[in-house]
Amino acid sequence: MAKIKKKEAKAKPLTRKEQRKQKSEFKKQNKRLYFAGKTNGTQRVAAAAEALAAQSQLGKNKKKKRSKKPKIINPDEIPKEQLLSGEIDSDDDESIDSDFSDAEVDALLPAREKMEVYEPLGKKVKKTTGGAIQRQDEEAVRRKELRQQKELESKSKKQRIKQLRIENEEDDREINKLEKKLKLNKSKDKNRLVRKMFNDGLDYLLDFVLDDEEEKRKWEEKQERKKKLKEQQEKEEAGMWSDEEEDKEDRDEPMDNFSEDDSGSEGEDDDEDLTGEEEQSEEDSEQEENAPKIKEDIYGRKRDAEGNILPDPVELEASAAGQKYIPPHQRALMAASAGSSEKQAEILARLLKQCKGLLNRLSEANLHKIAAGIEELYMKNSRYNMNETLTKLIQEALLGYTRTNERMVQEHMVLLAYLHAQVGSEIGAHFLQTFVELFDGYVKNIATLEVEDKQLNNLVLVLCYMYLFKIYELNLLMELIGKLSDQLCEKSVECLLLIFQSIGFRLRKDDPLAFKTMMQKVQSQIASAPLELKENPRLRFMVDILNAVKNNNMQKLPQYDPELAENLRKRLKAMLKNDRYVVTLNITLEDLLRADKVGKWWIVGSAWTGNLDEMGSAKQKQDKNSSKSANGGFADQLLELARKQQMNTAERRNIFCIIMSAADYVDAFEKILHLSLKDQRAVAYVIIHCALNEKRANPYYAHLALKFCQFNRKYQLAFQFASWDRINDIEKLSKPQIRNLASFLQQVILAAGLQLSVLKVVDFMQLDKLSFYFMKEVMVRLLLANDEREIYQTFERVAKNTKLQQFKQSVRLFLQHFLLQEEQLDKLKLKDEDRQLLQQRVDHIDKLLAYVDL
């Protein structure tokens, strides 16, 4: 052993390649040992070692002598355990263990620590107990893999479903948010969105949304419904025929005292009757087939199959009898007046009962429900019958001999306002005309009315709350108050006191000037009243109430509670649907009292038969004033001037005439607002057009434009767009027009009507002569204005805007390098003081813009 170790010490260490080769040889030897058995294993190992030594010696001779001879190991001297384990002692620094591990070889080796080897999932585990065990283990591993794969798939699916649910909830929240902004409430009306799309002209989008399959499915469902309906009708007809046959059989059954022979003979007769009926039904069906088909057109006239109009049998009978033909609607009226229409009387009685039941249950709690019920009755019955029925019931409920509860009057007037807005304005007009006619009749005989009779008081209260809920305008109520004040007595004072107590503060709020005029008129009437009336306590109390309303002192009014009426107004607004609102009727007292003579102009399609002389005189007056009415009341010179200025639309012509004929800019502003124009750009166009065509700059147009800009932002945008149009078309303007435009913009910009950024459409990189002249005029007028604080505020507003970096740099460049040139300053012909002031302000503005940019 010492000899071997001595040689090994002299041997050179093996290289990596040689070590790997040696390791593979050891593996082969161990395999041979395993298959050779236990008897001759040592001999085979020794022979293998000798063969290995010989091969290594041959290979070493062939190579260059790079290293010393390898050490020769005698296998007889190596222990068996060391040989089987593949571990050989040597003096080498590196030794590579054999990775060959076998179950039977490990069993022969002495006990040692076994390291647990964790193999990755899916790697086949080697088994030596048999092929069946190995296959079972492989199946178990495969099942485990499939189970784990399914678990992963289920988890991923659940996660995906959860994510989709979260996204759907986010989409629903976003949709609800947008629906809320668009005021679409699905809970109120599910088909409202589709109806909105049809109203907005977007119904064609539904054709793109509905594909062919859905249309086909809908068509099939429609066909199935038709088929089911047809089968049901056939069954009903069959049931009717069977019932008739059973009734006939019951009638034809023989009595108990009849004999069987008689019953048999009767049965034969029944068979004969049945055959006769079948023949008759066949003949009737043939006659029906041969009969000409008659249809009604949209006008109610009967036409045959070829389209010819058939004569009316009633008209033929009347002509044959030599009588005058009476139209159907007049026949119905004559029959109703004569009392021959029992069916109409039954309808009116039933309608009266239904309306009375609804009105008896009317209260603030169920106001919406009762209003919807009466609206439904309006849809099912004629409006004439409904108006007459409701008028009769409301007069019975509210216009009694005793004083009516004020809350009850308010609830009924809210109902009228709802019907006026939801069904039609002619309903409110009908009730207003009825109540005003009653009021006029009571006022004419007011001196004979007893103080205990409260019918006029109740009627005045009804008219007051009709005004409070905006059924008619303030002018009519002022006329009614004037009619009461003209005939001062104890009853009229009581009615005036009732008006001031109920809606006095509302009158003062709606039109203070009209209320002041009315109050002065009433006070003058009181001053001229007789002494007996002046000493009346009711009159003194009315004067106190009038002064309290004048001074806006609500505490002096006894039992004054405006909250109930205000709550009812809010409830009315909430009850109205489909963008409906109460249309306020602007009718005068004379129009209502003479409606039977001159007609109801406030109702569309209303006609009348009045005095022909009055109609002729009215026609003559109309011919005389036709030019004035056609021209809107403007002078011919103004209209000719508007035509020359190319005011080619009615809106522009009216705006132009108002601007030219107004007393001042406030008067022009109010008159233009009363036109209720939807196009704000027309106002801006006309004002700028007039400003440009003046000989010299007129500040009137700038003040008027500033008034509109401060009134609504829509007008501010309209003036901005109109200014941009003029700046973009500046080559079409003359120098006086450019000066007027610069003066107009300078005044509006300094007053904060428009921002300085209105000039951002000017291309500073390619300034032509006219654009340069325009910018020079604007900037010089801005910088030399009197109020220095307004100048700096104008530029500061632009300096704070971070989106206008390029515009601010362009303004700085224009001011420093173009405006302050000696040549340009000489052209301006400024005084030395103005030149220094201009230089000073330009430097300050340049620093302001530069500082904010930093």
Curated annotation (Swiss-Prot):
A cellular component term from Gene Ontology for this protein is:
nucleolus
Q: Any keyword Nucleus? A: yes
Q: Where is the composition biased (Basic residues)?
A: 60-71
Q: Where in the cell is it found?
A: Nucleus, Nucleolus
- Biological process (GO) annotations? ribosomal small subunit biogenesis
Could you name the domain of life of the organism this protein comes from? Eukaryota
Report biased composition (Acidic residues) as residue ranges.
Answer: 88-105, 242-289
Gene3D superfamilies in the cross-refs: 1.25.40.180
Domain (MIF4G): residue spans on this chain: 352-553
Task: List the SUPFAM superfamilies.
Answer: ARM repeat (SSF48371)
Q: Does the keyword DNA damage apply?
A: no
MI domain location: 650-764
- Where do Basic and acidic residues bias regions lie? 15-28, 135-156, 217-238, 290-306
Molecular function in Gene Ontology: RNA binding
Location (main, coarse): nucleus
**What segment(s) does the record annotate as region Disordered?**
1-38, 55-105, 120-161, 217-306
PANTHER family, per database record:
CELL CYCLE CONTROL PROTEIN CWF22-RELATED (PTHR18034), NUCLEOLAR MIF4G DOMAIN-CONTAINING PROTEIN 1 (PTHR18034:SF4)
What's the family? Belongs to the CWC22 family.
Could you tell me what this protein is called?
Answer: Nucleolar MIF4G domain-containing protein 1 homolog
Say which species the protein is native to. Drosophila melanogaster (Fruit fly)
Read off the lineage from the record.
Answer: Eukaryota, Metazoa, Ecdysozoa, Arthropoda, Hexapoda
